[in-house]
Amino acid sequence: VGAVAPKSEVNDTIVDLRPLVYEQPFQRKADKITDAKWFQMTYVGVPLVIAGLSVKHGSEHFRQLREDFVPNFHYGYDDYLQYAPAVVMLGLKGFGVESRSSWGRMLVSDAFSVAIMASVVNTIKYTAHVRRPDKSNYKSFPSGHTATAFMAAMMMHKEYGDRSPWYSISAFTVATATGISRILNNRHWLSDVLAGAGIGILSTELGYYL
């Protein structure tokens, strides 16, 4: 008579099989969602916009940190830094570094991205009427500089991210620095910057989709 496996081993075998039975359908559904085009286009940008809306009433705390530690921070480099990823991308293309798209396709996609970003940002600015931290006007939400910077960073990612992750890392580092500087310069709330980043990313995603 063959040996009978101990009860504990049988139970262990049953327990080990259960995840396979129950997780496979769930895994297939999860894979279907994450592979969907709409998910690929929105899984970063939408959460950033939602975060911007969610922290709207908590931005004063971050402004107070600025007032406590760097009250005299006033530098205009963010006026130029926002364009840096796009300038570098065009420079790489001009020097013959192969990108994802042809010149024509890249310029059309980028033009769509700019048009979408500008229209969305300005429409919200003129309807939300959020006062800037420095009280200069009521066009604070969302941050146009941050939207431009993240739109440009996403362009770089689309065109050169597959060649090296450092293109993407560098571009988004510059974009993040732009957003932070807008807060340090007392021109925007944290909520403005988060929403602007999300809008910029979504604009490029849609611009390259069209």
Residue ranges with predicted function:
Residues F39, F73-A84, R100-R105, S109, ...:
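Solvent-exposed, acidic/flexible segments
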Residues H57-Q64, S119-T127, H145-A149:
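Hydrophobic, membrane-facing alpha-helical anchors
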Residues V46-V49, L81-G91, I116, V120, ...:
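Lipid-exposed faces of alpha-helical membrane segments in multi-pass integral membrane proteins
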Residues K125, V130, D134-L210:
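Membrane-embedded catalytic cores of phosphoryl/pyrophosphoryl-handling enzymes
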Residues L90-S99, V120-R132:
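Membrane-helix exit/interface motif
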Residues V1-E98, R105-D110, L210:
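N-terminal targeting leaders of membrane proteins
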Residues G45-V49, L107-T123, M151-A152, L194, ...:
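Hydrophobic, lipid-facing residues on alpha-helical transmembrane segments of integral membrane proteins
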Residues L20, Q24-Q27, L65-R66, P85, ...:
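A generic structural signal for ordered alpha-helices
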